[in-house]
A protein has these predicted regions:
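N-terminal binding-site loop/beta-alpha segment at the start of enzyme catalytic domains
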Residues: 2-80, 211, 284, 291, ...
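Short, acidic/polar
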Residues: 35-46, 92-107, 164-166, 188-189
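Residues at the N-termini of beta-strands
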Residues: 53, 111-114, 155, 179
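CE4/NodB-like, metal-dependent polysaccharide N-deacetylase domain
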Residues: 96-116, 146-150
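A short, structured active-site edge motif that brings together acidic residues
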Residues: 77-90, 111-120, 184
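Active-site mouth loops of central-metabolism enzymes
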Residues: 27-37, 86-93, 128-130
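Beta/alpha (TIM)-barrel catalytic core signal, keyed to glycine-rich beta->alpha loops juxtaposed to Asp/Glu
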Residues: 88, 122-297
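Acidic (Asp/Glu)-rich catalytic clusters
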Residues: 19, 67-77, 104-108, 170-173, ...
Length: 297
């Protein structure tokens, strides 16, 4: 048991240094789909297991609960890395700044370790229009920069931004984004985007590293996981870590939280190439309606 705990704890000790010198734990807990009234218990369970990086968003509707969990988990605030996201619809400076302040009030926290723009387009426009909201993203980014300078945020970043979106933002940004949180998993590995971010010293974060569960239905992936003596979710999470990304598996189940951190193995270079080029899954099942999975609102 002691050896097991040591190996899991080692995983939680792994961190990446952002371009402003701030350290971010490489494995975090995603909280999408965790109800607000269950979020505090989920955060406390995760922290007890060893997680120190908690990721939420205005769109998740659980910031209050996540904040409660952070405040009552028994771990000093400065030992946790807490992230939220500016709503995708906030495309003016005023909306974004009001949202940042509202998040801090809702979570009852003095600062966030990071806040990011959730999407370059409002969700109702994703996969439906060509407009990349260049000026709106620049305005929202200015709000993040100002909140960062004021000490409300320790780091700032973006999510779901494509190369063209990042390039447009960099033209006027005073502060470079520290992360780009994207859909990244076996069967969806946009290497051009990943390499562009890495070249620009922007850390990639992987949300839905287990493809919202749909990767569990791929027999070839199950075979590779068995070869390493691990579960498919463990293989998927390890894959994103070996790409140099931060991994954010989402779950409210403490057993899954534990299992997701048992990553004391290494995928061979040969298998990494195979997984990078694995065929695209045809569907995200019932979750395919969400814009991040190609759906339309």
């Amino acid at each position: 048991m002691g050896n097991y705990n040591r190996k899991v704890n080692e995983m939680f000790d792994n961190s990446i240094v952002l371009n402003n010198g701030v350290k971010i734990p490489q494995l975090g807990l995603g909280t999408w789909f965790i109800d607000d009234d269950k979020a505090a218990d989920a955060v406390k369970a995760a922290v007890e297991i060893g997680y120190r990086h908690i990721d939420t968003a205005q769109a998740y509707g659980n910031e209050r609960g996540v904040g409660e969990g952070v405040r009552t988990c028994g771990i000093p605030r400065d030992k946790l890395f807490v992230v939220s996201k500016v709503a995708a619809e906030h495309k003016t400076y005023e909306e974004a700044m009001a949202g940042i302040n509202e998040t801090l009030e809702k979570m009852e926290l003095d600062y966030l370790d990071m806040m990011i723009i959730h999407s370059p387009q409002p969700w109702v426009k994703v996969n439906q229009c060509e407009d990349r909201y260049v000026e709106g993203n620049r305005a929202a980014w200015k709000a993040l920069e100002d909140a960062y300078k004021a000490g409300k945020l320790k780091a700032i970043g973006i999510s779901n931004f494509l190369i063209e979106d990042i390039a447009s933002l960099l033209e006027t940004a005073k502060i470079k984004p520290m992360v780009n949180q994207i859909l990244l998993h076996i069967s969806n590995t946009p290497m051009e985007l990943v390499e562009y971010c890495q070249k620009n010293n922007i850390v990639v974060e992987a949300y839905s590293p287990i493809a919202h569960g749909e990767i569990l239905n791929q027999p070839e992936i199950t075979t590779i996981a068995k070869k390493y003596g691990v579960t498919v979710p463990q293989l998927c999470i390890r894959y994103t870590l070996q790409l140099g990304a931060i991994s954010l598996p989402k779950t409210g189940n403490p057993e899954h939280m534990k299992s997701n951190a048992e990553l004391d193995f290494e995928i061979s270079a040969e298998d990494m190439e195979l997984l990078k080029n694995f065929k695209k899954i045809k569907s995200y099942g019932d979750s395919g309606i969400f814009p991040v999975y190609g759906g339309k609102m």
